[in-house]
Amino acid sequence: SKKEDSCQLDHAQGPCLGMISRYFYNGTSMACETFQYGGCLGNGNNFASQKECLQTCRTVAACNLPIVQGPCRAFIRLWAFDAAQGKCVLFTYGGCRGNGNKFYSQKECKEYCGIPGDGDEELLR
């Protein structure tokens, strides 16, 4: 089955006893969250990075979420969709938590959230 289909599954630690920090997609919060993976079995809702998790599982509904820096103190420049302005904007991400309204390039943000006919010819082709 496609990896995207796994996004709806609950995260599964599996029976092994490793303590591997992984990400799973939480459809309720529309965010990728951490869990401890045992290292074997489990299921497909299991990603090595928040980026891979979001890029596989987030939906266009993320575009309507608030822009959240999160509680951590890293200064990572990412893109988010500002629904009030109707456009993708740069914001500073703290490096943990937050939600799915978080994109790794302006292009990625526009592909999810861009409004056709906003003068962006790429979207009209």
Curated annotation (Swiss-Prot):
Q: Which cysteines are joined by disulfide bonds?
A: C7-C57, C16-C40, C32-C53, C63-C113, C72-C96, C88-C109
Q: Which UniProt keywords apply?
A: Disulfide bond, Glycoprotein, Protease inhibitor, Repeat, Secreted, Serine protease inhibitor
Q: Which residues are glycosylated?
A: N26
Site annotation (Reactive bond for chymotrypsin and elastase): which residues? Answer: L17, G18
Which SMART domains does its entry note? KU (SM00131)
- List the GO terms this entry assigns under cellular component, sorted alphabetically: cell surface; extracellular region; plasma membrane
Location within or outside the cell: Secreted
**Site positions per UniProt: Reactive bond for trypsin:** R73, A74
Instruction: Tell me the domain of life.
Output: Eukaryota
Would I find Kinase among this entry's keywords?
no
Residue stretches making up the BPTI/Kunitz inhibitor domain: 7-57, 63-113
UniProt main location, coarse: secreted
Please give one Gene Ontology molecular function term for this protein: serine-type endopeptidase inhibitor activity
- One Pfam family from the UniProt entry? Kunitz_BPTI
- What other note does the entry give for this protein? The amino acid at position p2' (17) appears to determine the specificity of the inhibition of domain I. Inhibitors with methionine in this position interact weakly with chymotrypsin and elastase; those with leucine interact strongly.
Protein function: This inhibitory fragment, released from native ITI after limited proteolysis with trypsin, contains two homologous domains. Whereas the second domain is a strong inhibitor of trypsin, the first domain interacts weakly with PMN-granulocytic elastase and not at all with pancreatic elastase.
What is the protein name given in its UniProt record? Answer: Inter-alpha-trypsin inhibitor
Q: Which organism is it from?
A: Equus caballus
